[in-house]
A protein has these predicted regions:
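All-alpha amphipathic helical-bundle segments outside canonical DNA-binding/catalytic cores
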Residues: 83-95
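Generic structural concept
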Residues: 95-98, 102, 176, 199-202, ...
Length: 269
């Protein structure tokens, strides 16, 4: 799927998305964070800002969370840009979604190595689940219709019991609720933000204890990368979809694309 090198190549920002744009009175005034800048294909910047994760709560508006792709492409060309090649745009949309998933994993690796032991790094590392779901939404069309329509397996039942002594998940939930009721209201500035990050981390941990999920499968990953197994294999897409839904429901249950995927795939929670 790799397209030919861009000819001519142009300056690519590398992190061109709404979070790095300054706008005043309806006009773009600055673009921030140029540390990923390089020469390459202009489609890369256009696709990156259209990733679901950067639409900030508006997954229904595929162009930066602001509008339709058709209007975006037309405005880009009218402003002096080139015509958009849909195949190149799609390649970069898939590629940069995978790239960001690897970036999230890299943050977890940085935390483990001691290079950056900040709480934010280890929590952002769990956002890999968002990109796993987005990739399945992007790539599902490559599967045969019968596989796209195949019902999903049932979700894994919770392991939590409401009898006996409090479970580990309930202990974690109790700490999270204490932070919310006793600590967060009095926190100021960055401390208030970090309390929210800590609560998010505890929520992830509690849900993981309630529904233990370990879908790491290196043999399957290697087989998919080599092409030995594909989405045409009966039941594989349904299995991957269920795994992605369950993982994301535990890690980032408020991610907007989760509800979209459940609806499109006919999945129960």
């Amino acid at each position: 799927h790799l397209p030919p090198p861009a000819d001519p190549s142009v300056l690519v920002h590398g992190d061109y998305r709404m979070g790095n744009l300054l706008v005043d009175d309806g006009r773009l005034t600055a673009v921030l964070d140029w540390e990923l800048a390089h020469r390459g294909d202009f489609h890369e910047d256009l696709a990156y800002g259209c990733m679901t994760v950067w639409r900030f709560g508006r997954p229904d508006l595929p162009a930066f969370g602001l509008g339709s792709l058709e209007a975006f492409f037309a405005a880009y060309r009218a402003a002096g840009g080139r015509a958009i090649d849909p195949a190149r745009f799609r390649f970069w949309l898939v590629y940069r979604t995978l790239w960001w998933a690897m970036g999230c994993l890299g943050m977890g690796a940085a935390w483990r190595s001691g290079a950056d032991r900040s709480l934010e790094r280890v929590v952002v590392a769990r956002r890999t689940a968002e990109q796993e779901l987005d990739l399945l939404l992007l790539l599902g069309d490559e599967a045969p219709e019968a596989e796209r329509l195949r019902p999903l397996p049932l979700p894994q039942p919770p392991a939590l019991s409401i009898q006996g002594e409090p479970s580990a998940a309930e202990l974690v939930t109790a700490v999270r609720e204490w932070l919310a009721s006793d600590i967060k209201p009095g926190a100021q500035g960055r401390d208030k933000f970090m309390v929210a990050v800590a609560m998010n981390a505890l929520g992830i941990a509690a849900r993981a204890l309630e529904r233990p999920i370990d879908y790491a499968d290196k043999l399957l990953a290697d087989a998919l990368l080599s092409g030995k197994r594909t989405l045409a294999e009966p039941g594989l897409l349904a299995r991957l979809r269920r795994n992605a839904l369950d993982k994301l429901a535990g890690d980032m249950p408020k991610y907007p694309a989760l509800a979209i995927a459940r609806s499109e795939w006919g999945a129960s929670e």
